[in-house]
Curated annotation (Swiss-Prot):
The keyword Cytoplasm applies. One of the essential components for the initiation of protein synthesis. Stabilizes the binding of IF-2 and IF-3 on the 30S subunit to which N-formylmethionyl-tRNA(fMet) subsequently binds. Helps modulate mRNA selection, yielding the 30S pre-initiation complex (PIC). Upon addition of the 50S ribosomal subunit IF-1, IF-2 and IF-3 are released leaving the mature 70S translation initiation complex. SMART domains: S1. This is Translation initiation factor IF-1. It comes from the Bacteria. The gene is infA. It comes from Gluconobacter oxydans (strain 621H) (Gluconobacter suboxydans).
Amino acid sequence: MSKEDLIEFTGTVMELLPNAMFRVTLDNEHTILAHTSGKMRKNRIRVLAGDRVNVEMTPYDLSKGRITFRFK
């Protein structure tokens, strides 16, 4: 799958779950399950409840996503 196939949304982290998973509410009021991207893990970027984030999702499963950016 290429980068062009991914869909990007902006949302807010609502809840921290085990195994580095997060419940994120998107701006369009949908709630998804998301995990942090590899570069965010490598650079030890912390994501807390209430943070605004960018989420990438595939068109095949719109209930899961990957957090790629945390806004300041």
